[in-house]
């Protein structure tokens, strides 16, 4: 049996990190690209930045040898900076990176919401991301 959870990481502390490590969880942490974009999209209940707390939770999980997946929701704003997003998330050091397109609500035209992404823009983002990853891979 394998366990996996997805979280914003705000409630992860040492005790949780130890529990997740001992029980061999894969923990997905939601981090939406660069700091400014993440904080715009994922403020706390008081409208404050969550970047430092989320990245601290990720570090705590890594310190305890928990497998981690960084999930980035690709919004229209995020899609404009695939290279910056790649390097920001790669430096955080998750075991896996996952890029999920931000879609419109059902029944709405594609790309009609200010945050949603069209298939073309998502494809452009993924190609830019791949190209940068490939350059890194070639460089060793």
Briefly describe each language-model feature range:
Residues 40-52, 59, 63-140:
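Radical SAM enzyme [4Fe-4S]-AdoMet core and its adjacent flexible, acidic
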